[in-house]
Amino acid sequence: DAPYGYIARTNFSFAGEVNNGAGYVRYMQEDKILMPASATKQITPSWIFKELARSFTNSLLGIDLKSGDFNRPKTSGWFVDQDFIARKSTSCSVVVQGVKVGENAELTTMWTVLGYPPASVVVPVWVKGASEQLPALLARNAGTKLSPLCDRAVTLRDRAFSYTQGMGSERYFNWELIFNKAGKG
């Protein structure tokens, strides 16, 4: 059921214990972005990947890393990964785009980002033919046993999350490597 035209989920259960689990701040940010976008019919797969899957806004803290206020020379360019929709442990982002009434259901498209979404690209996959052949970028490589696209995205993510000194250091990331005003993130 999607009374507002969309269904948003993070990683907590609506059926489980209230206030138990993670993802509440991320869910609130998703809903804050989706509600007006739904009302103005802005939601497209491209919009979802740009505005949600690659969001670096924490509404509880009132910050948006993409504002430019967290880049050099204003800061060091490093930040703590805390309750952004995109986070280090995110393994993929998927949008399923259905078909209109009367269209062939085999044309349903699964827009897929494998690996860390800010470091990956979107690849479409269709129901028709999916069982025979996935794009080579998405499919598991027989030699490495990894998806080439996911492997590359994880490598790029690890460059950004490269600080390893001390307990909790895995949460620090070089924001400048992901987003900067020069457009070279």
Feature roles, as predicted:
Residues 1-185:
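C-terminus-biased signal that marks the final domain/tail of proteins
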